[in-house]
């Protein structure tokens, strides 16, 4: 890991004015979650249709996946499509749901080569067959990879997730499989869509907006939040590395002193 980190640091300092002299390879956030925001405003400011922003944003995904893998981050969760996104214009929704297929068709060989494991967090209900096929194929072909977990939050909403978890738990109580007094935080976590993942250490939201948009509300209770005033299509590896540096300069207390 240290050798890999040293190579990254040299590449970084060769291309950027600011040297990350204080970054600690032993204190890398294990799980980074990102709300990829600002595609539409990026396009509007350039006089382009919103889908042009989403297309450009897909290029940013490539950069950040590589950056996360280089830093040996264990999990990268990307908020790709929320349950609220269905309310957008039909043409935009159709384009957004084609992006996973386009991305995976183009990048799956590289993801396999770089030992990345693809996972999905969200409801499959309502997703088009071409999206499901692309995601399922990627999950199957990368399931034995042991490097970065690339977790796509697709058709995901935290309130829906929590409601579903409560329904599952209530059913177990009703059937006598679980006593109400035995329900713990761990019980709830085990019934969430993210039950196969540790909670995020760092949550990044781009575009400067200061809200969580129904994203992993249970899981980010003790995450460090970083709201960055840059649209997602303009978000670079440099921004990502600066986010990691900011995380390392904070003291995580988990509710303590």
UniProtKB/Swiss-Prot annotation:
The keyword Metal-binding applies. Keywords: Magnesium, Metal-binding, Transferase. One of its GO terms (molecular function) is manganese ion binding. PROSITE patterns: UPP_SYNTHASE. It is an enzyme of class 2 (transferase). SUPFAM superfamilies: Undecaprenyl diphosphate synthase (SSF64005). It comes from the Bacteria. Substrate binds at residues 38-42, 50, 54, 82-84, 86, 88, 205, 211-213. GO terms for cellular component: cytosol. InterPro entries: UPP_synth-like, UPP_synth-like_CS, UPP_synth-like_sf. Binds 2 magnesium ions per subunit. The active site is at 37, 85 (proton acceptor). GO terms for biological process: polyprenol biosynthetic process. The keyword Transferase applies. Mg(2+) binds at residues 37, 224. Its EC number is 2.5.1.-. Its cofactor is Mg(2+). Homodimer. Catalyzes the condensation of isopentenyl diphosphate (IPP) with allylic pyrophosphates generating different type of terpenoids. This is Isoprenyl transferase. It comes from Shouchella clausii (strain KSM-K16) (Alkalihalobacillus clausii). The gene is uppS.
């Amino acid at each position: 890991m240290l050798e890999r980190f040293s190579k990254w640091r040299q590449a970084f300092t060769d291309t950027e004015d600011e040297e990350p002299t204080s970054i600690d390879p032993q204190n890398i956030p294990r799980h980074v979650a990102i709300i990829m925001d600002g595609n539409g405003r990026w396009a509007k400011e350039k006089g382009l249709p919103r889908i042009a922003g989403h297309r450009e944003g897909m290029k940013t995904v490539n950069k950040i996946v590589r950056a996360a893998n280089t830093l040996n981050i264990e999990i990268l969760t990307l908020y790709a499509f929320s349950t609220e996104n269905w309310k957008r214009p039909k043409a935009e929704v159709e384009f957004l749901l084609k992006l996973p297929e386009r991305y995976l068709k183009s990048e799956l060989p590289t993801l396999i080569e770089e030992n990345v494991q693809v996972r999905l967090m969200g409801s499959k209900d309502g997703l088009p067959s071409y999206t499901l096929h692309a995601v399922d194929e990627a999950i199957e072909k990368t399931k034995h990879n042991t490097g970065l977990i690339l977790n796509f939050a697709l058709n995901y909403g935290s309130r829906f997730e929590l409601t579903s978890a409560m329904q599952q738990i209530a059913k177990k109580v009703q059937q006598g499989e679980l006593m109400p007094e035995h329900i713990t935080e761990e019980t709830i976590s085990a019934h969430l869509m993210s039950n196969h993942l540790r909670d995020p250490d760092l949550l990044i939201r781009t575009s400067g907006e200061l809200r969580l948009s129904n994203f992993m509300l249970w899981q980010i209770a003790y995450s460090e939040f970083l709201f960055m005033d840059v649209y997602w299509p303009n978000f670079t590896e440099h921004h990502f590395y600066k986010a990691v540096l900011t995380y390392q300069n904070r003291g995580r207390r988990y509710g303590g002193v």
